[in-house]
Amino acid sequence: MSSGQQPPRRVTNVGSLLLTPQENESLFSFLGKKCVTMSSAVVQLYAADRNCMWAKKCSGVACLVKDNPQRSYFLRIFDIKDGKLLWEQELYNNFVYNSPRGYFHTFAGDTCQVALNFANEEEAKKFRKAVTDLLGRRQRKSEKRRDAPNGPNLPMATVDIKNPEITTNRFYGSQVNNISHTKEKKKGKAKKKRLTKADIGTPSNFQHIGHVGWDPNTGFDLNNLDPELKNLFDMCGISEAQLKDRETSKVIYDFIEKTGGVEAVKNELRRQAPPPPPPSRGGPPPPPPPPHSSGPPPPPARGRGAPPPPPSRAPTAAPPPPPPSRPGVVVPPPPPNRMYPPPPPALPSSAPSGPPPPPPPSMAGSTAPPPPPPPPPPPGPPPPPGLPSDGDHQVPAPSGNKAALLDQIREGAQLKKVEQNSRPVSCSGRDALLDQIRQGIQLKSVSDGQESTPPTPAPTSGIVGALMEVMQKRSKAIHSSDEDEDDDDEEDFEDDDEWED
């Protein structure tokens, strides 16, 4: 059983001595993905109630489990018959494991005192060794981590001070600074002359380098981060989590140092960043105005131009409308019939009964002298009934220039599929023209396609492109390697090889 001597470093499961190989295999399958048992034993679980009496809780196989997904260690008891977890206790910080008896081990649980009563003392011995070795290793690592912050977090930049007057005392000064106990011993002895401001010369080749705000343990300090650096990180798509991540932030810090430091990065950023933004911001505004400015003009043009054409087309446009509107009749009388209905449209301007008689004579004389005289009396009565029933289709028949204009406007409305107007039939060419103008505005507002300027791509050259390339390489490295191994050094008490798949 040499495998149980160094369980924390093993990646294989350690079964119980009292179980068969098949039972141990079943136990291993109950552990869960990426979980390993470092020691296993058949036990009874006891808990001390308020009366300080041990009470049995359950029986099963106890396992010291290394849970890689949770990055922690647990004591877990499984029922191998039902294949379920009966109890668990995480090994918290300062966990103390006692063994008052070789077969009876106790420790403080989350809610009460807990004890494991082992069925086999050999198993109890191996189990105890696995737990104590793990606790000891964690203790040593935590002490190392506690001592580490005492040292310098950042390498101190050395400055060469050329002054011959203090070169003879440089070695002594370093001893005084680095060895405190020797300094205390020499206090009683004769004191050497201390340096004064006059003895210290001015430094040569001194350059002030801005502080990046990066700490090797906590990453970048987001509260005190330089605004220009933050702008650079935003342009490269670097998140706050990446700036806080120890490894990723170190990659970014190394990049800044290799580039020449914070000031060099900021100067490069100032030289490159300003030019691109203006064009990208100035580009979008121009396109929108053209559509808006071009949209309104067309409708008015139609409104002004519409009246002139109708008069010239009046003689030619008047004949066509009648045939399509009356497909059943080809004889000349129908056109006059259509001519006479117009009198009703004039009703709004004058009395209902008065308008019919006057218009017929005038229209008959202007458009077709022979046909109008015979039919005037009969057609008079039919139009009124026809108007209420078929007002939408029979109304566009007025003759003359106004009639032609009205016919043209109405034909245009039919072609544009807006004839289902709820408003009353227009009584004059002016009203019809106004309707056409309104309809034209509605159609115009949705007819034009919008002109869109392609967005200017973000700059990927210079300092921004270089940093983005570094971050892409970092991302590929993270995804290509195992996720568990990448995050190993983030644990406070674990080594790089602690967590495994």
UniProtKB/Swiss-Prot annotation:
Residues 442-453 have a biased composition (Polar residues). InterPro entries: CRIB_dom, CRIB_dom_sf, PH-like_dom_sf, WAS_C, WASPfam_EVH1, WH1/EVH1_dom, WH2_dom. Residues 31-138 form the WH1 domain. Residues 273-387 have a biased composition (Pro residues). Its main location: cytoplasm. PROSITE patterns: CRIB, WH1, WH2. CDD domains: CRIB, EVH1_WASP-like, WH2_hN-WASP_r2_like, WH2_N-WASP_r1. The modification Phosphoserine is found at S239, S480, S481. Residues 135-158, 263-403, 442-501 are annotated as: Disordered. It is found in: Cytoplasm, Cytoskeleton; Nucleus; Cytoplasm. Binds actin and the Arp2/3 complex. Interacts with CDC42. Interacts with FCHSD1. Interacts with FCHSD2. Binds to SH3 domains of GRB2. Interacts with the C-terminal SH3 domain of DNMBP. Interacts with SNX9. Interacts with the WW domains of PRPF40A/FBP11. Interacts with PTK2/FAK1. Interacts with PACSIN1, PACSIN2 and PACSIN3. Interacts with NOSTRIN. Binds to TNK2. Interacts with SNX33. Interacts with NONO (via second RRM domain); the interaction is direct. Component of a multiprotein complex with NONO and SFPQ; associates with the complex via direct interaction with NONO. Regulates actin polymerization by stimulating the actin-nucleating activity of the Arp2/3 complex. Involved in various processes, such as mitosis and cytokinesis, via its role in the regulation of actin polymerization. Together with CDC42, involved in the extension and maintenance of the formation of thin, actin-rich surface projections called filopodia. In addition to its role in the cytoplasm, also plays a role in the nucleus by regulating gene transcription, probably by promoting nuclear actin polymerization. This is Actin nucleation-promoting factor WASL. It comes from Mus musculus.
